């Protein structure tokens, strides 16, 4: 796989606060190789390592996208949810940004059933069918539809398991990560200083609490995905 240049520079990462880890008391010793210093009670992430692994991740998603592979982006913490939705829509990726429902991937048949109910309800609403129901029943179905939209809206067009899963905040999304490991789905994870770097196929050390840091990482990955899909469209 030929390496490409993704314009990942130190100044931009510093400005986005990518280097700021967790407190020195809240860390995983396995992250030691990815930490360059301690400052005012927090660990400072080695941005040279961040750039290296982010570049590797961009290469991977570029070539996967150029072959038409499908991606799922997962990030449900308060700093990530909005950025995940925007980035995913930009690159036409599936996403989960509110809550990971246990078994979403490992019990795919159940997820498919939920998605079909969601599609059916949404179609019924568009046709105006819910307006013809008794008020109590219509209200109940509208609430159900709103809940399905909240938790499944980002995967409503997913017809099978994703080829690659991108995880923002590995610590919070541990259940999603474990499901990917069980199914053998490759993962790219944004890992802060309290994470285990050995759990993902590509682990990108970075601040997972700052919106600017999350946006920086996602923007690079999404740009690479878009470039990959574009190169696929240009093939004769």
UniProtKB/Swiss-Prot annotation:
InterPro entries: Ribosomal_uS2 (IPR001865), Ribosomal_uS2_bac/mit/plastid (IPR005706), Ribosomal_uS2_CS (IPR018130), Ribosomal_uS2_flav_dom_sf (IPR023591). It is found in: Plastid. GO terms for cellular component: mitochondrial small ribosomal subunit; plastid. Transmembrane segments: none annotated. Keywords: Plastid, Ribonucleoprotein, Ribosomal protein. Disulfide bonds: none annotated. This is Small ribosomal subunit protein uS2c. One of its GO terms (biological process) is translation. The keyword Ribosomal protein applies. SUPFAM superfamilies: Ribosomal protein S2. CDD domains: RPS2 (cd01425).
